[in-house]
Amino acid sequence: MEKGETKIKLGYEILWKFIIRPPRDDYPLNYLGPSQFKYNSKAYIRRDFILISHQGYKMPSSLIEPLSRPCKKMPVVIYLHGNASSRLEGLNTLSTLLPHNINLFIVDLPGCGHSEGDYISLGYYESYDVGIIVDFLENLPGTGNIGIWGRSMGASTGLIYAHRDKRIKALCLDSPFANFCRLARELTKQYINLPDFIINGILKIIGGTIKEKNGIDIFRLNPIEEAENAFQPAIFVHAINDKLINLHHAIDIFNIYGGEKSLKCSEIGGHNSKRPKRITQEIGNFFEKYLQNNNNEFDINEDNKLNEYKINYVNDLNQSFVFKSGEYYKNRELYNSLKEENEKKNMDDIKKILLNINENDISKESTELNSNISINEKK
């Protein structure tokens, strides 16, 4: 094999991995924080579980709830993270949900964090995993109404799933993409202005490789087609300056969304930025409005305590770093800065690859890919 051909093959490998095998957020487990802690003088516990995904992969997950329940049934929000992220991301929502007496469920989706699985599917397989999570929560004593809060891939996953299940009562969709093929074209043109025929050829080859490895036609992933059938109240969130998923994706979904809806745009930050306090407050009020109702009867007594757990909670809030203003984010900012450096390097590599691809490269690669697919189909 010639040096040029090896370079092109390496280039395509980087491109398809960027979509279904982004850098894994292999976080230190102590970043989950203490399993018992206090927030606003109230004791909480984190209970860890292993769920089995639709494809048979282990998914580490956690439920965060108060030690002494204010009611027999408490609402819970399932947080669905982004594509190169993990359940760690969901901890950012605790200060939004806990003051409203809403529990939080976080999970490492397959191919992410400490879960099993080699690839992600940007919402296709993950949407089936949401059903497994909902079934699990329904079978836990004390589960009230269930909501979904998803970001990026997680937002599109939530949109794909929600209309299938009446048990989901409310949605927060932060930075969803409407159609993956459109998103891929936009990202390609953003980094380098290639002719349409080259972009089409690149996407065709990458799509074929992804289908061979993951079994899905990634460029037919179209979350927006589920929006019209959705019926749950939803709050959409998007950064105006999001360079990864343009604001028009959220606007397009919002315009045809079938349920009660509102759109909150952030003028601060971009795709992965922390949302302004005014928006997180609105999200908290939104979930309280739609998840706290007569199904969650308030009944404060000893029977509502999780007596089977011996709690040695953190008395000094500084030790809990999840809630201490700045402490948690100091750890995460350092961690995120390293991730952002890697992501920038990946995008720079991709840009160089795209600049060196020509029509002959696409033709050769497409012929070889079709040949491999035919051989596999015969097997």
Give the location of each predicted region.
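Short alpha-helix in the alpha/beta-hydrolase fold that links the catalytic acid
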Residues: 232, 246-254
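Short beta-strand/loop motif that positions the catalytic acidic residue
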Residues: 229-231, 236-238, 242
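Catalytic histidine-centered segment of alpha/beta-hydrolase-like enzymes
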Residues: 269-280
